[in-house]
Amino acid sequence: MELTGVTSQSIFDDNAADLKLSWVAGLEGADRAFDVEFAREATSAADLVGHLNLIHPNRIQVLGKPEITYYQRLDDETRKRQMGELILLEPPFLVIADGMEPPPDLELRCTRSSTPLFTTPVSSAAVIDHLRLYLSRISAPRVTMHGVFLDILGMGVLIMGESGLGKSELGLELISRGHGLVADDAVDFVRLGPDFIEGRCPPLLQNLLEVRGLGLLDIKTIFGETAVRRKMKIKLVVQLVRRNDGEFERLPLDSQYLDVLGLPIHMVKIQVAAGRNLAVLVEAAVRNTILRLRGIDTLRDFMDRQRAAMQADAVSRGQGRLL
């Protein structure tokens, strides 16, 4: 996993409010980060944070009530040895959860070694879940793509095409028909799971749509709160192409896909020409995609019917010749 620039300070700043964190020791270790080799070999955020574990000392160590109780039962020599081994390998930081007070000797050792020590009243399980989700988000593969990203009938749809084809105008018409804007011009996509890519709008462009001749439109102000969305999962790409595009296939037999962060996203191509109602075509493409996701393929059904009709006709002709 890629965690460049992620430090104890940045994790604390991003999660202090949600987890009610207090920094009680090791302030000098604010720049401490994950071991580079350890982070590279981690397959998921579950490898980066967990309950106290001396076998995996390089991860974020969370100590709840059971761990503190266990620690307090140890004799002084065992405490010193085990914590010494843990601190020596420089975990990013330690978290004392469940509202427990940090043992004085552990707090002193963290201070001397510049190991950040946080406390929180939140349960240890909740802390681990929250930090795993946080680390998954900041380390996830991401890309910025050009287009208009919309919520159409509950489906995340990215409208793409070369400049001047009317992507923003089409987006504006779809918004006026009750659909929602996620982002215009630049869309930030993050792969958060094996089959889950989330799209968001960069903060600078939030709620804005640029239309030639009109300039920047604040969609939230013009159409209201329900006309914008914070994020959506991408499920469909609509590629606008010019009428004279020789590569356009009228009835594609095989589904078309666009690779986004290593995940194939279903794509349809729509020709742009005078008199064509693109908004209706996009809505129809979305409805058809919903049917495909449910296992209903209209083109395949038609081909099966055609094949059955041809076979029946061939049988009928053969029987006629026999007579």
From Swiss-Prot:
Q: What does this protein do?
A: Catalyzes the ATP- as well as the pyrophosphate-dependent phosphorylation of a specific serine residue in HPr, a phosphocarrier protein of the phosphoenolpyruvate-dependent sugar phosphotransferase system (PTS). HprK/P also catalyzes the pyrophosphate-producing, inorganic phosphate-dependent dephosphorylation (phosphorolysis) of seryl-phosphorylated HPr (P-Ser-HPr).
Organism of this sequence: Cupriavidus taiwanensis (strain DSM 17343 / BCRC 17206 / CCUG 44338 / CIP 107171 / LMG 19424 / R1)
Instruction: Enumerate the InterPro entries for this protein.
Output: HPr(Ser)_kin/Pase, Hpr_kin/Pase_C, Hpr_kin/Pase_Hpr_N, P-loop_NTPase, Ser_kin/Pase_Hpr-like_N_sf
The entry's protein name is: HPr kinase/phosphorylase
Q: What is the lineage of its organism?
A: Bacteria, Pseudomonadati, Pseudomonadota, Betaproteobacteria, Burkholderiales
Enumerate the PANTHER family for this protein. HPR KINASE_PHOSPHORYLASE, PROTEIN YJDM-RELATED
Other facts: Both phosphorylation and phosphorolysis are carried out by the same active site and suggest a common mechanism for both reactions.
Question: Which residues of this UniProt protein bind ATP?
Answer: 161-168
Pfam families associated with the record: Hpr_kinase_C (PF07475), Hpr_kinase_N (PF02603)
Arranged from A to Z, the UniProt key words for this protein are: ATP-binding, Kinase, Magnesium, Metal-binding, Multifunctional enzyme, Nucleotide-binding, Serine/threonine-protein kinase, Transferase
Originating gene? hprK
